[in-house]
């Protein structure tokens, strides 16, 4: 235990160091989830393209196999879909704080990185990022990009 005792029916937490302090009710701490989507976007399964809750935005992995067969084209297409979803959420790419890039072949990293680099070029603070080879991706995609952003309007 972390030195705290919380009783689920009480509005107080007891700590060893400070005694009781008030905790807002759950309804005041948790906002409803809101779906984010772009009309006409193709989905590759039973999921929501994006979700907003508690000042955060989570976008599902974006792929664009229609953009072409090479990694650069698919990266540009996935990033364009991310831009559209962020716009639907009422923010810009500057709100992105983390990106995860999945590649079907890590040998295509540099090709993806050139397109991604151009996308983040204008950002004052570039998102934290992870990139790795995931093997086979949905619909034969070469690249899939997942992002998390801050709801700057919250």
Briefly describe each language-model feature range:
Residues 5, 9, 14, 20-97, ...:
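N-terminal presequence-like segments and the immediate start of the first folded domain
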């Amino acid at each position: 235990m972390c030195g705290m005792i919380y009783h689920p029916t009480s509005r107080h937490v007891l700590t060893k160091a400070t005694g009781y302090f008030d905790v807002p009710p759950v309804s005041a701490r948790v906002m409803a989830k809101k779906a984010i989507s772009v009309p006409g976007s193709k989905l590759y399964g039973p999921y929501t393209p994006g979700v907003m809750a508690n000042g955060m935005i989570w976008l599902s992995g974006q792929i664009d196999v229609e953009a072409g067969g090479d990694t650069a084209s698919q990266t540009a297409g996935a990033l364009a879909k991310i831009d559209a979803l962020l716009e639907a959420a009422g923010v810009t790419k500057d709100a992105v704080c983390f990106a995860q890039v999945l590649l079907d072949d890590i040998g295509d990293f540099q090709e993806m990185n050139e397109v991604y680099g151009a996308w983040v070029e204008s950002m004052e603070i570039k998102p934290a990022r992870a990139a790795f080879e995931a093997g086979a991706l949905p619909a034969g995609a070469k690249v899939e990009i997942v992002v998390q952003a801050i709801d700057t309007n919250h």
